[in-house]
From Swiss-Prot:
GO molecular function, one term: poly(A)-specific ribonuclease activity
Gene Ontology CC: one annotated term: nucleus
Subunit structure: Component of the CCR4-NOT complex, at least composed of CRR4 and CAF1 proteins.
Subcellular location: Nucleus; Cytoplasm
Reaction catalyzed: Exonucleolytic cleavage of poly(A) to 5'-AMP
Ranges where the record places region Disordered: 115-136
Biased composition (Low complexity): 126-136
InterPro entries noted in UniProt: CCR4/nocturin_mRNA_transcr, Endo/exonu/phosph_ase_sf, Endo/exonuclease/phosphatase
Keywords: Cytoplasm, Exonuclease, Hydrolase, Magnesium, Metal-binding, Nuclease, Nucleus, Repeat, RNA-binding, Transcription, Transcription regulation
Name of the gene encoding the protein in the UniProt record: CCR4-2
Annotated organism of origin: Arabidopsis thaliana (Mouse-ear cress)
Residue numbers binding Mg(2+): E302
Cofactor: Mg(2+)
Full protein name: Carbon catabolite repressor protein 4 homolog 2
Main location: nucleus
Amino acid sequence: MLSVIRVHLPSEIPIVGCELTPYVLVRRPDKNSTTDDVPESAPLEGYFLRYRWYRVQSDKKVTICSVHPTEQATLQCVFCSKRRSLVPKSYHCSPKCFTDAWQHHRTLHERAAAENNANEDDDLNRNNSAGSGSLAGSLSGSMSNLSIANNGPAPFYPSNITQKNGGETLVEVGGCKTYTPTADDISHVLKFECVVANAETKQIVGHPSTILTSRVIPAPSPSPRKLIPVNGADGMGHLDQDARIQSAGSFTVLSYNILSDTSASSDLYSYCPPWALSWPYRRQNLLREIVGYRADVVCLQEVQSDHFHEIFAPELDKHGYQALYKRKTNEVLSGSTSAIDGCATFFRRDRFSHVKKYDVEFNKAAQSLTDALIPQAQKRTALNRLVKDNIALIVVLEAKFGNQPTDPSGKRQLICVANTHVNVQQDLKDVKLWQVHTLLKGLEKIAASADIPMLVCGDFNTLPGSAPHTLLVMGKVDPMHPDLAVDPLNILRPHTKLTHQLPLVSAYSSFVRKGIMGLGLEQHRRRIDLNTNEPLFTNCTRDFIGTHDYIFYTADTLMVESLLELLDEDGLRKDTALPSPEWSSNHIALLAEFRCTPRTRRG
């Protein structure tokens, strides 16, 4: 007969909006064990599995700490408590919790004061009156405005909860195997029940197998990143559906390495809470972030093949995006093709139509290079060094929106978008440079045939000032560049061949163009390295901080209108590094708004 062996949840901490899928191991009538579902519609020898989810409701309300969601709140910031949008961020589990989080928490006060009226600005000054603007002084002032949360002691993992016993009641909230917590579940424990039932009588057979979760927590909500105009206009805009500052004829491009699930190991990112590192949570948080940017073109890296087909393509399709994908060429981990990641490019169907797609496999280029230039005795060594399974996805799109320059035939504007993920191994400087040069040569051919604006996006795994970065933005590499010393296969010689004719410029260098002023621009210039004109970082982990991600564009056909604001390192360090509960990748998203300009002939 059918029986349940055991059940458990991959994550003990349920989050609002994040689907819970229990692991259920059953023994079939033939004595074999399986995790396959046995629904009422397909019973086994007259029996099926019945599922129930319950909310454990208590007469006692429990409030959760906004910084440590597994802890009960004991303090509340008075300033935040009076502003509805900040209430979820107002709770803290201890004075130390509030003190440690103050550097980030203070920015919430400042942002609220700036975005609302002068009265709130006065409140901020009163709250911080004990200091002169220093961290210690400001914190002292706000500590005096903490209130004690009216919550008695309550165990984090309740035990022996039964229906209508001791002020607690079970409220059925779901009848499927999976359940997605709602806002009504916040601060409550959930109970999952799995039991074998008779298909004919519907009667329960045996005892149910149950799990109690910890208390449901709200999904962390990072402060929205703003779109900063860099074309001389004053002001800042939100990237929301009802108030986009994007003007007619312009378009936005997003580039984001989302950190594949196979790469998100607890060993590498032990500082990130397990629930925030789990794929079910990160998936939901990444989708919410990506959809929220409402970019016209989205370039993602490290998208696993199964996640593209099962999650990203169908979910973004609901928001009007068409999807294109190129996976890497080698299998990883268990050898499953689903574990291979790649590059995914999405575009809004109401803004663009698909014209052409090019797949770039650096492995094939490596094979051709080896066959042509490497002596037979060195071919195996050369292939071992060059074959790294990296790829690029190039798409040509036709604009559907107005106010775009057209060619003499009257056709709408074409735009070429390259999305790539270059080799990560830092010692293979020659391989990185060769991959970037190979991509640029391919883009040059497309540009020569169509003479269209070009965008080159992705994770290049190379720092500003490196040989690959220099080649991209300068069109050549100084023969004395130190990176060129690493060339055991002589694939970079002669160095004079390391050139290209595309007038590429990094979009984020627009933050430091002379003569451009605007609200908030000076603040964001401080997040740019003035030696390289690139962001101080796009990748921030415990052991590394630096810039690996870029959006390049051809400056003779495109101009930058706006840029997505960069993140502040101090704000990220409150969670040690990335990924974190608020930001679910070890990289940050980059986004730029462009406008096509009248073509000038490339010489």
